[in-house]
Amino acid sequence: MAAAQRWLPGILRRGDGLARRLYSSASSLLFDDTQEQFKESVHKFAQETIAPHAAAIDASNHFPKDVNLWKLMGDFNLHGLTAPEEYGGMGLGYMYHCIAMEEISRASGSVGLSYGAHSNLCINQLVRHGSPAQKLKYLPKLISGEHVGALAMSEPNSGSDVVSMKCKAEKVDGGYVINGNKMWCTNGPSAQTLVVYAKTDIAAGSKGITAFIIEKGMPGFSTAQKLDKLGMRGSDTCELVFENCFVPHENVLGEEGKGVYVMMSGLDLERLVLAAGPIGLMQACLDVAVPYVRQREQFGRPIGEFQFIQGKLADMYTSLQSSRSFVYSVARDCDNGKVDRKDCAGVILFAAERATQVALQAIQCLGGNGYINEYPTGRLLRDAKLFEIGAGTSEIRRMIIGRELFKEE
């Protein structure tokens, strides 16, 4: 504890400034002046508003009770970056969304994951497929941070094979009655608005799935106990329970039987935005490791002077920069209307696996201190691993890329 108290504040303080110097020249190759200014402003906001709570969020497994991070991010206009201005959004592109995801995740992986589920999985689904009435009803409060959003596809026995879901929506007068369960729902315990997929025709396979907008407090809808996760702690995750939950017809998102279209049409962009999360975690690893090896002395000199430590830093740096370049080049293509499924799967596959390795290297650079929870490196490793599993496992991403390449002429 004493060692951490002696080293950690200086490391994080010096690491922040050092990181800005180290990466300013590289980022200028990726961003125009406006995007660079946006990145600096989000960085400052995240470091001042979110980063001070990161360790406590991980330890307590919940967001701070005395600070409403959702509302603060809403006040900073981060939730609706890709949403139309008429609903309170910014009307910007995925370059900006990825920048925000990177910097928030750099400050706290848990907050970054919850932010991504809210702004990307929920808000963007409503933007792309909501009716004018649905957008007017739900988007303003989600964008302001007054309400929290979530999305639920997976079930206890339906993860990667999402089309095999058992949650059923039976058509009745005026709407549908939903019965079943959803699993691993990020933001589930705190969400007021949820996009949920259910089978409206069991015999129709992928053509029998429909997307619904579920509101907290609907009779028959409840959340089970919050899940105790290895990492991304504080980013609330739970099981959703539907017991004869009536959902009015006007809460169908898109059309009946078109749920897979709603799901798949946004999945590529969802993978892209989430891929910026591992970028932020890799940056956070370097924020800690580089200043530490400058200060930590063994054999009479800073350990950063030893070539094997410099080699680790070089590997960490190139993993970060190659991942960052890949993510933002794909984001730029998406903003230009060129959405490539294999590239969107590729960016999160590559960045997620690199982030886990970079976090391991950061722990190794800190040695015994890296294994102590007073330092952030262990948290960064536990957070990074999620991105190899959530939003489609690495194995599924490889399958998507291989399938797309096989189909090409």
From Swiss-Prot:
Segment annotated as transit peptide: 1-22
Location of the active site: E270 (proton acceptor)
Compartment annotation: Mitochondrion
Reaction catalysed by this enzyme: 3-methylbutanoyl-CoA + oxidized [electron-transfer flavoprotein] + H(+) = 3-methylbut-2-enoyl-CoA + reduced [electron-transfer flavoprotein]
Cofactors named for this entry: FAD
One matching Pfam family: Acyl-CoA_dh_M
Database matches in PANTHER family: ACYL-COA DEHYDROGENASE, ISOVALERYL-COA DEHYDROGENASE, MITOCHONDRIAL-RELATED
Protein name listed in UniProt: Isovaleryl-CoA dehydrogenase, mitochondrial
UniProt organism field: Oryza sativa subsp. japonica (Rice)
Lineage: Eukaryota, Viridiplantae, Streptophyta, Embryophyta, Tracheophyta
